[in-house]
Design a protein with these regions (language model features):
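Glycine-rich phosphate-binding/hydrolytic loop that grips phosphoryl groups
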Residues: 160-179
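Residues at secondary-structure transition points
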Residues: 3-8, 39-43, 47, 64, ...
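DPxDG-like acidic metal-binding loop motif
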Residues: 31-65
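Phosphate-handling active-site elements
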Residues: 19-25, 54-63, 80
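N-terminal beta-alpha supersecondary unit
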Residues: 1-34
Length: 179
């Protein structure tokens, strides 16, 4: 949705709850993304989530978009299939939201909005020719288009599931695991 979040969000929430045959009294928690993302969109979502949480005395948990996407990669994959995980999210601008984690899920380059060329300068300081890099997130293709030739062989093939954008299921799984 490009515009109109403020007027659309509560009716969308009410419709989803109604269609699920649940009521807010059935909820044990509410999860909301805390960014990165559009400042206005984040404020609207956080205000709606906080309003529902306070009104219905339900715990509220904030989830980073990077954390929500990263949780798709299971523990076995982390331990065996790559050295670094790049989470690249579409910012709907020229830059991307990018974060880099190691195979233990520890942040090695903190996330934020960054030009991919600037990011690759930082990344090159962390890798050698044997470092394997997995890319996930809906900005992965854009990131790889700008990858320097001298490190391109470090990147693992991207599967289709890894290209999917963040969705509510990712946020819910992450919140459930953190609760």
């Amino acid at each position: 949705m490009e515009r109109g979040h403020g007027t659309a969000i509560m009716p969308m929430i009410q419709k989803a709850i109604h269609e699920s045959n649940f009521s807010l009294s059935d909820f044990t928690g509410i999860a909301v993304t805390i960014g990165p993302g559009s400042f206005t969109g984040l404020r609207i979502a956080m205000a709606a989530a906080k309003g529902l949480a306070i009104t219905h005395t339900i715990p509220l948990i904030g989830i980073s978009c990077f954390e929500a996407v990263a949780q798709r990669v299971n523990q076995a994959d982390r331990a065996s299939s790559y050295d670094l995980l790049l989470i690249a999210l579409n910012s709907k601008r020229e830059d991307l939201y990018i974060e880099c984690r190691d195979s233990l899920n520890k942040k090695v380059i903190p996330g934020g909005a960054v030009n991919s060329n600037v990011f690759f300068v930082k990344l090159k300081k962390l890798i050698d020719r044997h470092t394997s890099i997995r890319v996930i997130g809906d900005g992965g293709a854009q990131l790889l288009e700008n990858a320097p030739v001298d490190i391109y062989d470090n990147f693992l093939p991207v599967n289709e599931k890894d290209k999917e954008p963040l969705d509510a299921t990712d946020v819910a799984h992450c919140a459930y695991n953190e609760a």
